[in-house]
Amino acid sequence: MIVSPSILAADVLNLESAAARMIAAGADWIHVDVMDGHFVPNLSFSPSVVRALHERFTIPLDVHLMLDQPEKYVEAFCRAGASSITIHEEIAADRAEILRCIRAQGVKTAVSIKPNTPVDAIIPLLPLCDMVLLMSVEPGFGGQKFNPV
């Protein structure tokens, strides 16, 4: 099992100390939720935050792109130090091509689905994925109640 707490709930003025506490508590990775205000109704971290965490810590950074157009940002997050990048099944873009682009940069790949998306929707993408993220809440906000769907 890999413990990968999200830094989304941290005080944005104290991300460095929040990351240090996660590591001290035994986190294996740090999960970085990236939101664009379109795919989900919230905004969060940019590649510069991932770069800052990468420069200060050696822990793997698991970047979750909740973006309408992740293809525009994948290379920037790879360069910033992402260890893995997750994209969503529900986007309109060519998901397979995005996953290939991520892998070509030496970064692990993952695909995610929202709670009501059928699991079999991701079957064609599995050969291109190192991981799968099954959302237990609707993406966009931290601290939600678990959805047993």
Predicted regions and their residues:
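Short gly/ser/thr-rich secondary-structure transition/capping motifs
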Residues: S112-N116
